[in-house]
Structure formats: structure tokens, C-alpha cells
From Swiss-Prot:
Gene source species: Schizosaccharomyces pombe (strain 972 / ATCC 24843)
Swiss-Prot/TrEMBL keywords: Cytoplasm, Fatty acid metabolism, Hydrolase, Lipid metabolism, Nucleus, Serine esterase
Lineage: Eukaryota, Fungi, Dikarya, Ascomycota, Taphrinomycotina
This enzyme's EC code(s): 3.1.2.-, 3.1.2.22
Catalytic activity: S-hexadecanoyl-L-cysteinyl-[protein] + H2O = L-cysteinyl-[protein] + hexadecanoate + H(+)
Protein's UniProt name: Acyl-protein thioesterase 1
Length: 224
């Protein structure tokens, strides 16, 4: 059992029939993404969970502690990965999913996702979770620990819709990594992944990517 995550939770205003679990990026918090629930208030049946990453030493932050799902050794070489940290955080996300199942929410009514680091953890966790999820959505990320696939892929992963959005000139997570991951998911792993690049040079969520995520949420769990 891994350490339990502290989360910002926004409960539905009607009967709870679906859940979204969304992970923030490096140095952020669950509160920083809770605006999604307020902006998408028409999804009255959805419970929103925005977990807070633990504060850990981060190499690119001169070893100082900050909220992070795993260590980042270098922004210049993002393929050098903190495997233990990624696996630990993916396990914590699995436990959050398990907790929703225990409340009676079917796995195919649980949508997971995230931004940057949160996107990467969500991709790994979703593709390795043993039950079929409603979907996986992420912005400004790529598939971590890619060498573990396809062997790490769950037997139901090919049934899970995936949305990967990113900015074409992202200064932190190069779009070439996001694009390559999307192509790998589609062509090599034969997964149902939507590859959605948007013009822009910021490491942030654009209005276009936000709308794409809204439409994706509407498609996979929008109906009560």
C-alpha cells in the first residue's frame, strides 16, 4: 500500500454516476486545476478529484522539495526517467480508482487525466490498470517508461479512448515527444488515441485544448 494522497474533491450536485481524476503538473496543486469542475458545471453527475502530489526533492530544482509526481533529472533529456517515482505515482492513482469502484462507480465511468507530469502518470496508470476505464486524457505529456510496453499493457487497454493534446512549440515538453507518443500508441500499440496538436508556444492549457478535453469528457461520461 502506497501513501494516501490528499485531494481536492468536488462532489456532484445530483446522483453520483461518474468520476474524473485529474493530476496537476510539476510544482502545482490539485486546487490549481479545480477550475475545471467549476467551468464544466453542466456535468452535475460527475465527482471531481484533483490529487495533490507529495513534496519531494526535484533534481531540476537544485534538489529542493516541491510538489512532484516523480523526480525530473533534466529538462534537456526528458527520456531519462525516474522509474520508481513514476511507478509509485501510478500505483497511487490506481488506488484512487479502486476507491471509486468501492463506492459503486463502474470502472468505465471513471475518466483519468492530467497536465504535463500528471498527463504522463495518467497515461501509464491508465494503460496498466486491469479494468476498462472511461478514458484517459492529457495535455503536454508523453508516454513514460515506453520500453515497458507492450508487455505492461493491460488486456483491456485497447478498449480505452485516449486524448492527447499538446502545443506545437511547447518550451518544456517538446511537441516531438508528445507527437511520437501519440503515433506509438496508435500505430504500434493499436490503441484508440486522438492526436491533437494545437498552435502555441506555451507550456500551458490553451482554450483549444481545453475545449477538446471538454468534448472528450462529454463523449465518454457526459451523460448521467
Amino acid at each position: 500500500m502506497t501513501a494516501k494522497l490528499n485531494s481536492v474533491i468536488i462532489n456532484p450536485s445530483v446522483a453520483h454516476t461518474a468520476t474524473v481524476i485529474f493530476l496537476h503538473g510539476l510544482g502545482d496543486s490539485g486546487q490549481g486545476w479545480s477550475f475545471m469542475a467549476n467551468t464544466w458545471s453542466n456535468f452535475k453527475h460527475i465527482k471531481w478529484i484533483f490529487p495533490n502530489a507529495p513534496s519531494i526533492p526535484v533534481t531540476v530544482n537544485n534538489g529542493m522539495k516541491m510538489p512532484a509526481w516523480y523526480d525530473i533529472y533534466s529538462f534537456a533529456d526528458m527520456k531519462r526517467e525516474d522509474e520508481n517515482g513514476i511507478l509509485r505515482s501510478a500505483g497511487q492513482l490506481h488506488e484512487l480508482i479502486d476507491a471509486e469502484l468501492a463506492l459503486g462507480i463502474p470502472s468505465d465511468r471513471i475518466l483519468i487525466g492530467g497536465f504535463s507530469q500528471g498527463c504522463m502518470v495518467s497515461l501509464y496508470a491508465g494503460l496498466t490498470y486491469p479494468k476498462r476505464l472511461a478514458g484517459i486524457m492529457g495535455h503536454s505529456g508523453f508516454l513514460p517508461l515506453a520500453s515497458k510496453f507492450p508487455s505492461a499493457l493491460s488486456r483491456v487497454a485497447k478498449e480505452i479512448p485516449i486524448l492527447l493534446t499538446y502545443m506545437t512549440e511547447d518550451p518544456i515538453v517538446p511537441s516531438v515527444l508528445s507527437s511520437a507518443s501519440a503515433k506509438y500508441l496508435i500505430n504500434n500499440l493499436q490503441l484508440k488515441c486522438l492526436d491533437r496538436p494545437f498552435e502555441g508556444d506555451a507550456h500551458s492549457l490553451s482554450s483549444e485544448s481545453f475545449m477538446a478535453m471538454y468534448k472528450f469528457t462529454q463523449t465518454v461520461i457526459g451523460s448521467p
